[in-house]
């Protein structure tokens, strides 16, 4: 949801305000993702108390869940960097990167399951590699296509976070309402 505000200020050429949204969204997302990652690590440590897992699969399942939470962390903090493709109307580049990610994903699954004995945590490794490709591409686009935008701690604004969270929550509630309403048809 931050992309909307970043793009509006960017196109108004108010780079100070755009950078305030960029920095606030980045640090806000990082804080949220870090808290969820910490909770996820605690969950992983005690996963057998929450889920019924065969003893021989516990380590593999723990690794998978840990990799899923790490993947979530990077996907979440990547969000602000993805705004560049919308700002510059270059969704084609993002689409191309996703296609490359899908191809890498297929190749990795085929290679890993051909070369090694099957393990459930391989799925987490492949997810993390694909996320790394998307993450690096988003950062490259951000720095090269929108050099006016920067993530700086001094530009973090609690007011900007409140605005983004407030509108984001309202948007989420609205989307939930639409989903529930369309599900009742």
Predicted regions and their residues:
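Helix-loop junctions and terminal segments of transmembrane helices
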Residues: 1-12, 26, 87, 146-148
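Membrane-interface helix-capping segments at transmembrane helix termini in multi-pass transporters
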Residues: 13-23, 34-68, 115-125, 151
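Residue-level recognition of pore/gate-forming positions within transmembrane alpha-helices
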Residues: 24, 33, 72, 101-106, ...
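Residue-level signature of transmembrane alpha-helical cores of multipass secondary-active transporters
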Residues: 29, 33, 64-68, 72, ...
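Alpha-helical transmembrane segments of multi-pass membrane proteins
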Residues: 42-45, 55-78, 107, 132-133, ...
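Membrane-interface junctions at transmembrane-helix termini in multi-pass inner-membrane proteins
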Residues: 73-97, 110, 121
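Membrane-interface helix-loop junctions in multi-pass transport and translocation proteins
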Residues: 89-92, 103-136, 140, 144
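Interhelical loop/hinge segments that connect adjacent transmembrane helices in multipass membrane
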Residues: 120-124, 138-183
